[in-house]
Amino acid sequence: MENHSETPVLQQHRVLVANRGEIAIRIMQACIKLGIPFTAIYTAEDKDSGHVLFAREHGDGKALYRVSSYHDANELMSVADISGCTALHPGYGFFAEDFRFARRVTKRDRSMIFIGPSWKIIRELGDKINTKRLARSLGVPTVPGSDRPTYDEMEAENIAEEVFDFQLRHSIEHPLVLIKASAGGGGMGIEEVDDIDQFRSVYRRVRNYAARQFKDEGVLIEQRIMDYNHVEVQILGDRHGHQVHFGTRNCSIQSTGRQKRLEVAPGFDPSVNKYSFDSDRVLQDITTYSLSIARKVGYDSAGTWEWIVTRDGNPFLMEVNTRIQVENGVSAKISRIKGHDGIDLVAEQI
């Protein structure tokens, strides 16, 4: 990594930047650093936005195309063909974690490189329940609860009763159960229940929301863990079997809508805060656990492993985000490759 000896080969490619805004600019900047031409897209509403201005200033005659929607896969493929793109970077959001889209990019008659994990890995790790089952098979700790999609109301209620009983047996003062859309993400499709008598109505609401938003009624029932740190492990892998981590981030400061507001790196810093547990040991454990999953599936791009760490220092894996993220720049700031800083994780991903 950071040895761009293949740059002459890279220059034979053109990257379709299938996104907008901040991440589109980061992708274009990485392409410029690597000497790769790019093609950006924009909608009528975005004609004066930053990524459009950047593409006009730094791109060539095929650097910018107008589309009707960032969500129209057919239109993206058409732009790729017209401009001669050989690779596509989805950024985050939109198609970034859509394994069907990634498969289409690589399997179409005029195939392109999908700059992200393989579609099979996105499919495997993109489902929280698949990830949970894989983690448990490797001895990686996960939040107590179901490890497969639940579609039956009675089955879901039985699981919820077991989770409530588990918390009562462990003298948890205010037992709570989370009902989560298994295909959800970004804090969407999650509600909590503190009374089993209220379970069915909340379950139906989450199930209906999941069907509308994610086209999948699958629901995950888990213990609601209170008073925790939300810690992330930044992973990067290549297609030659190498996976490494770029440290940890703490994103516990979030809005009421579970949107991250502040990222701190590393995940714990005993020189700043005092902890009731061995914070260095916990960070070592979660990076080791994260890499074990990455190596098991042959992870081959940038990704983030999301963890809950309780106030007693017990870590539980929540999910894997199979994409580049807004906060990847925080990890880059605390990392070095062969003693050199100035890391660009988007460039490394490409």
Language model features with spans:
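Acidic/histidine-enriched active-site and ligand-binding environments that engage anionic O-linkages
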Residues: 160-179
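Active-site helix-to-loop segments that bind/position phosphate- or nucleotide-bearing substrates
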Residues: 142
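A residue-identity detector for tryptophan
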Residues: 54, 119, 164-166, 246, ...
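N-terminal loops that bind phosphate or other acidic moieties
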Residues: 153, 157-166, 204
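ATP-dependent carboxylate activation and anion-phosphoryl transfer catalytic cores
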Residues: 3-38, 60, 71, 81-83, ...
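Generic detection of short hydrophobic beta-strand segments and adjacent strand-loop junctions
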Residues: 148-150, 191-194
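ATP-binding N-terminal substructure of ATP-dependent carboxylate-amine bond-forming enzymes
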Residues: 1-138, 147-159
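N-terminal cationic-hydrophobic initiation segments that often serve targeting/anchoring roles
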Residues: 80, 164-168, 211
